[in-house]
Amino acid sequence: MLNYSKSEKAFKEAKKVLPGGVNSPVRAFNSVDATPVFMDHGKGAYITDIDGNEYIDYVLSWGPLILGHANPSVVDAITKAAMKGTSFGTPTEIETELAKLVIERVPSIEIVRMVSSGTEATMSAIRLARGYTKREKILKFEGSYHGHGDSLLIKAGSGVATLGLPDSPGVTKGLAADTITVPYNDVEGAKLAFEKYGEEIAAVIVEPVAGNMGVVPPIEGFLEGLRDLTTKYGALLIFDEVMTGFRVDYYSAQGYYVVTPDITCLGKVIGGGLPVGAYGGKKEIMEQIAPAGSIYQAGTLSGNPLAMNAGFETVRQLTPQHYDVFRSLIKRMEEGLTEISTRREVPISINKAGSMFGFFFTDQKVINFDTAKTSNLEFFRNYYREMLNQGIFLPPSQFEGVFISTMHTEKEIDKTLEAFDHTCKTLRG
């Protein structure tokens, strides 16, 4: 049993000054009935807490750290930029350089606007879609998280295509009424929604690989079907690649699945661990944004030079060969988890995409939020705490994706599988 006494003390202090003791809800460890671990430093594939416990890190700051912790080139880029000044509120050349790199790698993007978070990117993309199409309704998918913008915090009702209800106090019924929600991977549900509301729908926003119900890839024909529907009805297709951008493939998820959206939202990896977001797309659409056009969006720290330098250095280092290694390592993980769970009689369903994967304690194939919710959450809670005590740091929620970095090797995968085997043996008796 690891010692967490310093983290426990730090959490008590944090709760005096922060809501729930954290600055983002999942960090509170509520879903695993544990005290959150306070981190001190990270290096490569490892992270160390304030009690001195070292873990193999599969959270990687919720995805951004694709090169691992404290990558020397990224740290050097940030340090050099900071020595020149942390922010100017004016254009800098590094903004243009990162924009060129993003445009080169992401098939749908001809022009890109930098912002400060993934939430800001999706909120701005929705406003752009509404302004461009002169329509108001948005279609999203149940269980998909697109940041905490009011228009997107909507819970699905019953039926195939139901106008939503607010999923958080403070979200107005008026905003909820403009958001249509259908199950993920359900093209027929989307078709019915368009048949009923097609002339009112400004855009469909979708994660090409869902990452906030666990990792759920698109079934064959799903993304293609959405592309066809939006084109037919004159709506825009928005890919939320905040999580999947540069995670699923060298050319992001849209390059891997060969489906081109009208607007793409990015974040996480393109900031190299610093706060950043971006949205981009076709020139004729993006030039509607001020000051080129009349659709307003602005930000004090948009294009912050520290984030731009960190992002540029991160994306610059990635090569197609990295993704071959990612897939090989995750295949090794999948095969090991499958063998152990079969031997230990633990039902498991595994999904993967590039450098992301997810697993659910269920015998059902997980293709949407309903099937994701069949996972045994009580088993997950116990499993999580046991894995943590063996030095494996995983997302403290069943419904979050798991990530690897260029610093993860077969050594880390095999150690994780050993811990998984021990955990299953312990929990199954």
Curated annotation (Swiss-Prot):
Q: Which cofactor does it need?
A: pyridoxal 5'-phosphate
Q: Which InterPro entries match?
A: 4pyrrol_synth_GluAld_NH2Trfase (IPR004639), Aminotrans_3 (IPR005814), Aminotrans_3_PPA_site (IPR049704), PyrdxlP-dep_Trfase (IPR015424), PyrdxlP-dep_Trfase_major (IPR015421), PyrdxlP-dep_Trfase_small (IPR015422)
Location within or outside the cell: Cytoplasm
Which SUPFAM superfamilies does the UniProt entry name for this protein?
Answer: PLP-dependent transferases
Catalyses which reaction? (S)-4-amino-5-oxopentanoate = 5-aminolevulinate
Question: Which domain of life, per UniProt?
Answer: Bacteria
The N6-(pyridoxal phosphate)lysine modification is found at 268
Which EC numbers characterise this protein's activity in its record? Answer: 5.4.3.8
Q: Which GO annotations describe the biological process of this protein?
A: protoporphyrinogen IX biosynthetic process
Which residue ranges run through the membrane? none
Q: Is Disulfide bond among this UniProt entry's keywords?
A: no
Give the chief site where it resides.
cytoplasm
Pfam families according to UniProt: Aminotran_3
Enzyme class, broadest EC rank: isomerase
Q: Name one GO cellular component term.
A: cytoplasm
Q: Which GO terms describe its molecular function?
A: glutamate-1-semialdehyde 2,1-aminomutase activity; pyridoxal phosphate binding; transaminase activity
Ordered alphabetically, the record's keywords are:
Cytoplasm, Isomerase, Porphyrin biosynthesis, Pyridoxal phosphate
Associated pathway: Porphyrin-containing compound metabolism; protoporphyrin-IX biosynthesis; 5-aminolevulinate from L-glutamyl-tRNA(Glu): step 2/2
| Quaternary structure and partners | Homodimer.
What's this protein's family per the entry? Answer: Belongs to the class-III pyridoxal-phosphate-dependent aminotransferase family. HemL subfamily.
Task: Enumerate the HAMAP family for this protein.
Answer: HemL_aminotrans_3 (MF_00375)
Q: Which NCBIfam families match?
A: hemL, PRK00062.1
- What name does the UniProt record give this protein? Glutamate-1-semialdehyde 2,1-aminomutase 1
| Organism whose genome encodes this protein | Listeria welshimeri serovar 6b (strain ATCC 35897 / DSM 20650 / CCUG 15529 / CIP 8149 / NCTC 11857 / SLCC 5334 / V8)
UniProt gene name: hemL1
